[in-house]
């Protein structure tokens, strides 16, 4: 996975259902603080059991989530998000997310997650 120090765009983030209702200035601030990363097919974005301090949204490609004991847990497509449990609860990653195709994700750090994203889960 190679981070490109290019922020996500407001347009990209507005396609994420969780984020779509954010006010324009808030989604713009979030976009500036997210880092875009290209992921090769077959590569893991996060690994179950690892420390997790980033929240991710899928911008392109198809990824799968799986757990060692339960197997496949789902497919992630553009507009989906993952990685919220670890930073929200301070626990290790609960699943491995791997790219099935070349993919692009954008992620933010725990501070940004706590400030902008976490309140969206309170509803």
Functional labels for PLM-detected ranges:
Residues 1-123:
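Cytosolic regulatory regions built on CNB/CRP/Popeye-like sensor folds
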